[in-house]
Each structure stands twice: as C-alpha cells, then as structure tokens.
C-alpha cells in the first residue's frame, strides 16, 4: 500500500511531466479560454480513484482559472447522498443522527452504510431498469416485474456482481434458471425487432447512439459507419421470442439472417458481423444459389425444444468477441455513473461516446475506465469513489453561472419519478405506505417524470398536472392520511414551530425569515381552517422546485 506522501509525489510527478509535454506539443488556442488538461494517460493503476478524481478536477480548475464553490454543509450532503444512493430523502431521525454526529469520518461512514442496504439495490435496480428498458404503463411494468427482470437487477446489485458479467447475461439472453431468467427480458421486450435491439445495445452498453448510421456513415463521427449499424443488427436478427415453462425466453435460429444494405451511392453491401472498432466475427456466407436447411445437428441439444441454441450462435459470438473486453463497455459505465452522481457526464450527453463529443477530461475518463475493468467491474466501488470526491461534496452555485463541464459546483439534478414518489411518502409518513406505492401509482409518476440522465431538464404540462391536480398527492398531503401532518398539528402549539418542522422534514433545512413570514401570514388568515392551511403549506413545499431537485 502506497503512503499518502508517496502517492502524492507520484501523482505530481506524472502530472507535471504530462502538462509540460502537452504544453510543448499542443499550445492552447489563443481564441479559447478553456484548456483541456489531460495529464492522466501515464498514471499507473492501483491508486485511490477518489484521490485521482480530486487531483484531475483541481488541476482543471487551476489551468482554466475557475474556482470551486465551498464544501456543502452536512444538511445538504445528507439529503443529497440519501437521494442519490437509496432514492429518497432521509427520515428526520436519520438526518438528525448524522447532523449530531461529531465523527470526522461520518460522511464516508454514511456512504458505506447506504451502499450496503437493500434500499440501495432496489433504487439502482429502478435506475438501471429505466436506462435499459425505459418507461412504460402499469401493465408493462407489471409484465417486466412478473418476468423477474426487476428481481434480476436487484440481485445483481445486492450481490455486487461484476457488471461485465451481467451485461453478457443480458445480451446473451440464455438464462434458464428461475434466479437468472429475468435477464432474458431485455431482448424479449424488444418484440423480435433486431434494429430496436441493436440500437438499444449500442446505447445502453457502449454509450453510442448508432441509429443515425442506418442509412449512411455517421456525418459527424467518422468512426461510426453504416456497416457497423447493419453488422450489429445481424448479430440479433436470428433471435425469436418464445414462452417457456420458466417464463419469457429468446431462441435463436442457426440459419438465415443474411441480407444486404445499400449505401448512399446505391451500392449493395453484405451485413457482415462487425461492430465499432472493426471487431469482426467470421461466418460462412451462403451464395445466392445455396438453399439453407434448418437441421437438428446445427443445434446444441437441450431440454426445452422451444429454446433453440445453435452451435454457432451469433449472439454468443457477439458476447465473446465484441462485448467482452470492449473498451467502450467500461467507458460507458463510468460516464453514466459519473453523470448520475455529478449531474453531467464527462462526455455529455452520456450516450454520445463518439469523436464528435469529446470528454471534458479525456485522460481521467480513460483512467477510470481502466480502473473499473481492473476492479472486476465493481459498480459499488465506483459509486463509493465518486461520492467521496471533493466535487461531489461541493455546494451548488445558486444564481452564479458556472461552466458545468469543470464541475466547480454541485449541479442540481431532477429527482426521478421513483425518487420523487418515495420521498413524498417518506415526508408525509402515511399509515400504510404500500397503499401509495402500487403499480398504478408508480406508472403515473413514471409517465409524467420519464427522464433519467436527460440531456437537459425541462418541466412539462404532464408534470404540472400531476403535482397540482394529482389525486394521490392531494390525498396523501392531508390530515386524513398523513401521520406526519396530524402529529405536527397535535404536538406543536405555535405557528413558527409548525412551519420550522415542515421545512426541516420535507426540505431538510430551516426556513428563512421571508418564508416564515409568508407562512405565518397564510396561517393567520385561516384560523378557522387550520388543518387545511397546514395541508396547503405542506403541499406547496412538496411541489416546489427545491423539493423536486437534488441540490
């Protein structure tokens, strides 16, 4: 184990050497004030990722003459980390326990504790589900739950299984056991549409939007070619959904799937098994006069006649020759999790890992991707490293403009549908939380708040209608259903005490003088409707932008 002193010396040596070499070879653009600092290419593995991130970002601040905000206070941090790691605001008792603790290492201890909970696995299963499958209605949400997809994701996160192995299982879609059978849902849910599958696989596992290469080579990123699009489609165009005794499955034919595509010049080209980086899989291609015959000897024998597995499997070849050890798998994972924790990826948007969208810190992204691969694709370790960085623990910039690519301030992040719904339940404390967490309730929130890691956050009419007229929110924010509001009314005599408790419980902070005056004025005019007045203030806080964002 390297001592902190030796580590720092090593980092500074590599840093200074790399900066000097870069400055000599690539002088800054005289018309640009932004200098991309990339001293991390020669940095060895085995170092603490948190420390590497801190030093990389701090050097970027120095070179670009930008200053970070102050460290977020404990009240802001505890709300932020609960939302990011377990998908809800902290309960009052949890927040108070953290705020009253005087241990200097309490932030690290809290991060470790939250990452080891079932809530973390459940929350990130929802995040991965939204990223990999997308939003849907209550019926479809019920189907994917019944197909054990959600359980599969929870188990992977609870056991902290290597992400590359999980990715292979999902793309191969050949899990027959009840425990792993849920992995099949990713392909099954695409309903035998190989182009949809190819576009999803490229975006979800490699961070590359390949759909614009369907008709021609990518006009802005030359490394993405039309043959890569149709080559990726070919890996999946022999797949077919089947329903087995264990649930949804994806069979695969041993023949067919040979076609051609036309480029802009009208020339027809074969759809060879190839993807980005020219990772090609050789396959014997029949001539036009050859007639393929589907025979039993082309398949591996198995107990389920519906679930055919060919001896030469295109999906298997893709997993073995393309997905396994592909550098984009680690890069895409790092970038997406960075975006989740920091509010923006090192490459932005997060699904554009191409030459047209260079990373803000290219060497750092390279180093973190190699570090993730060397750590056996340990997702939890990466999340922990990000949560402990200086950048993650900065305060927000409030009204001051900051260039987000330098991560000099915490970027406000909109709560996902699940985070918002769960946080409302935690704040209002209904007697029966399950009543407010049905498939229908979850689907209504997901429909109105569909985005996860969106390029930009834009409120819409559906969100406004749900928050202002949604029956579930109005019902829950009532004395009838909220144990918190009833307790507030019964235990506190003064308006100031009620107002303070509302803000502390819902927003995790005390109200300022203007907020106290406004709320007191509202209550004083409704003495004969005190219950409704308290409900109104609670509803206003719950539907505020401050509550709907993680700051």
What is each residue range found by the language model?
Residues 22-58:
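N-terminal pre-domain segments of enzymes
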Residues 83-84:
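Post-BTB helical module
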Residues 6-17:
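Bacterial N-terminal signal peptides
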Residues 47-79, 89-116, 133-428, 455, ...:
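Primarily short, surface-exposed interaction patches in extracytoplasmic proteins
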Residues 118, 122:
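Metal- or metallocofactor-binding catalytic centers and their adjacent structured scaffolds
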């Amino acid at each position: 184990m390297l001592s902190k002193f030796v580590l720092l010396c090593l980092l500074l040596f590599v840093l200074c050497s790399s900066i000097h070499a870069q400055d000599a070879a690539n002088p800054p653009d005289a018309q640009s004030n932004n200098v991309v600092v990339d001293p991390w290419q020669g940095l060895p593995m085995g170092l603490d990722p948190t420390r590497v991130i801190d030093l990389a970002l701090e050097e970027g601040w120095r070179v670009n003459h930008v200053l970070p905000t102050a460290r977020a206070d404990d009240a802001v941090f505890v709300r932020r980390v609960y939302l990011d790691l377990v998908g809800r605001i902290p309960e009052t008792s949890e927040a108070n326990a953290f705020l009253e603790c005087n241990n200097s290492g309490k932030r690290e201890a809290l991060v470790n504790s939250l990452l080891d909970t079932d809530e973390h696995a459940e929350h990130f299963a929802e995040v991965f589900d939204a990223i990999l499958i997308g939003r849907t209605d209550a019926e479809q949400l019920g189907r994917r739950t019944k197909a054990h997809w959600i359980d599969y994701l929870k188990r992977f996160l609870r056991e902290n299984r290597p992400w590359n192995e999980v990715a292979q299982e999902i793309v191969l879609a050949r899990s027959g056991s009840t425990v792993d059978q849920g992995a099949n849902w990713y392909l099954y849910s695409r309903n035998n549409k190989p182009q949809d599958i190819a576009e999803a696989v490229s975006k979800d596992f490699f961070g590359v939007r390949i759909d614009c290469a369907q008709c021609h080579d990518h006009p802005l990123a030359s490394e993405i070619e039309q043959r890569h699009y149709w080559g990726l489609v070919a890996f999946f165009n022999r797949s077919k959904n089947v329903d087995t005794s264990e649930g949804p499955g994806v069979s695969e034919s041993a023949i067919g799937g040979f076609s051609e595509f036309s480029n802009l010049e009208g020339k027809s080209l074969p759809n060879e098994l190839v993807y980005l980086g020219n990772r090609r899989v050789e396959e014997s291609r029949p001539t036009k006069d050859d007639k393929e015959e589907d025979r039993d000897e082309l398949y591996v024998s198995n107990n389920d006649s519906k679930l055919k597995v060919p001896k030469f499997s295109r999906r298997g070849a893709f997993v073995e020759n393309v997905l396994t050890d592909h550098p984009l798998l680690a890069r895409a994972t790092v970038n997406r999790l960075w975006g989740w924790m920091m509010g923006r990826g090192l490459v932005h948007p997060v699904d554009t890992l191409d030459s047209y969208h260079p990373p803000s810190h290219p060497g750092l992204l390279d180093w973190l991707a190699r570090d993730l691969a060397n750590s056996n694709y340990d997702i939890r370790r990466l999340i922990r490293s990000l949560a402990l960085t200086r950048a993650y623990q900065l305060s927000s910039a409030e009204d001051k403009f900051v260039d987000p690519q330098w991560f000099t301030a915490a970027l406000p992040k909109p709560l996902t549908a699940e985070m918002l719904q769960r946080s409302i339940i935690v704040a209002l404390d209904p007697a029966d939380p399950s009543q407010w967490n049905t498939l229908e309730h979850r689907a209504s929130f997901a429909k109105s708040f569909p985005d996860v890691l969106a390029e930009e956050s834009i409120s819409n009419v559906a969100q406004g209608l749900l928050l202002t007229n949604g029956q579930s929110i109005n019902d829950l924010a009532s004395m009838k259903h909220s144990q918190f509001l009833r307790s507030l009314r019964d235990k506190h005599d003064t308006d100031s005490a009620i107002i303070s408790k509302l803000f502390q419980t819902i927003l995790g902070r005390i109200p300022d003088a203007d907020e106290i005056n406004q709320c007191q004025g509202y209550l004083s005019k409704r003495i004969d409707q005190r219950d409704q007045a308290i409900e109104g203030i609670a509803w206003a806080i719950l539907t505020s932008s401050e509550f709907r964002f993680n700051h």
